[in-house]
Amino acid sequence: MHILIATDAQWVVNEVKAALDSPSTTFAVLSNGREVAPAVAANTPDIAILDMQVGSMGGMAITMDLRLDQSSGALPKVPVLMLLDRVADVHMARRSGADGWTIKPLDSLRLRKAVTAIAGGGCYAEGIPTPDLEEETAEEAVAEDATVTEEVAAEAVAAADTVAQ
């Protein structure tokens, strides 16, 4: 398995590697969010693990950038696990198009469980803060948000076309 990690915090790299390292696992570690899309284009990972805060381009912006490039066919679909700082960030993770998220502090069991689910084509969600959403499965939440993300991406492309004219 090839895992891309985007974070500027060495402790996050250490935690993720400790939880997921195996003889068949390789890691690409990036400390600048702007490097993620080119890295995906060069060597598509099985999963991208994105810290919510990564220098000048955080996990939400990185995920939205990836999803926009994927919707245009410029990049292949890459499953994204976002590492959130707090429960309040769940809304942003859902809206960005992430396939799953976990809330820090990290632990090996939850990381392995999340990566297994997401890399296998599923979803993983923690900390959905509103009672009416607790019954919604992670897959339903991500599917709903993917539609919203596609609509936002289409609006962004239309706006860019208008500006270009």
Region annotations inferred by a language model:
Residues 48, 101-102:
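Two-component signal transduction core modules
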Residues 1-20, 48:
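Conserved acidic segment of CheY-like receiver
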Residues 61, 82-101:
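Alpha4 helix (beta4-alpha4-beta5 surface) of REC/receiver domains from two-component response regulators
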Residues 106-115:
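C-terminal output helix
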Residues 46, 50-68:
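Conserved phosphotransfer microenvironments
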Residues 71-79:
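His-Asp phosphorelay/catalytic-motif detector in bacterial-type signaling
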Residues 24-32, 39:
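Short hydrophobic/Thr-rich beta-strand motif most characteristic of the beta2 strand and flanking loop
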Residues 122-165:
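CheY-like receiver
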